[in-house]
Amino acid sequence: MFRKANAVPQNTSNHILGINIDSQRILLVYGNLSGLISERLEFASPSSAPFPAFLSELSSHADRLLMITQAQRLPLPDVVSVSVAGNYDAKTGVVGSSLEFVQWRAESLRSQLELRFNLPVYAETKANAGMLAEMLFGATGSLSNAFYFTFTPRVRLSLLSEGQVYHNPGATAGSIGKLRLSSSENLPEKAQTLNDVASGLGLLRLAQFRHPTHWDPDLQLPDLLQSALDRDPFALEVIDQAAAIFGCHLECLVHSLRPEKIIIGHPFHLLGEAWLKPMTDALSQASGLGGGELSQIQASALGSRQPELEALAPAIMALRGARER
């Protein structure tokens, strides 16, 4: 169902098939360069499946999405844009082995998607794609030196330096969730790293540990976040603890690089001040920085559209950059 194309059409109305991949769910969107989403489709991620099986299921759902857009007489996409969890090397197009996709072994994600869809593919890690979405659509003004954090499935950092997103061979940079906790007091017995407390899964484990009788055994992250937004004191207590632990563990990073802005991304950006205040207070106390010395800390302003715009951002940034050259 994809147009044969050897080069990206140089017009202002490129249509994009956006794919947001993590170990829990996959989001497909049909959008354009302005970030307008016409259709979306979401399904559970076959993260435990081998890579060929993953590609087959992804292709099947993409066909379903495009059948819907074709019924609306929308053009076929010109490019594919991908945000993917794990260690994706944007230079080689290879996803390395990671806990997110346990059966993947140095898989050629970009070339395989190009082969499947016969379209140019632009891809980034979730954290880097999130940073690009902020640069394109965020209400943050001009970004030059900044941190962007994403929290699902694990805590990951994107570093923006002089307006350029940092990449390293193998795409292992930014795995800040692997930081060892400085203290395990009042934490689950097996909590050893930042991922065990401040990632989406870590937050769920912390909530069950702190108040096991308050939550359903199958508590899901959206339900926990909504409880915090509804001012549930048990949820707020857990958020406060996790955010404070996260903030104090940024001390060395902030002192070393002194970013102008620190942006909290998906999904904890939805918590607003419930996450920002304890995080900021803890970072200020741990670092000794305050007032004008501390980086500006803010939540992404993209709201519930963040995953959709994250999916589109790698292609939009690449296409805009090509036209400016």
Residue spans for each PLM region:
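N-terminal charged helix/coil linker that caps or initiates catalytic domains
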Residues: 1-17
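Short glycine-rich, Thr/Ser-proximal phosphate-binding strand/loop in the N-terminal lobe
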Residues: 16, 20-54, 95, 175, ...
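Short glycine-aspartate micro-motif
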Residues: 16-20, 77-81, 146-150, 156-158
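Short, acidic, Ser/Thr-enriched surface-loop or helix-capping motifs
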Residues: 32, 90, 160
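Glycine/GP-enriched mid-protein hinge/lid loop-to-helix segment characteristic of carbohydrate kinases
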Residues: 40-42, 49-54, 114-117, 122-127, ...
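Glycine-rich phosphate-binding loop and adjoining helix at the ATP-binding site
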Residues: 46-59, 63, 67-145, 273-285
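Adenine-nucleotide phosphate-binding core of ATP-dependent small-molecule kinases
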Residues: 52-70, 191-197, 202-263, 267-273, ...
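Glycine-rich phosphate-binding/hydrolytic loop that grips phosphoryl groups
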Residues: 122-136, 273-325
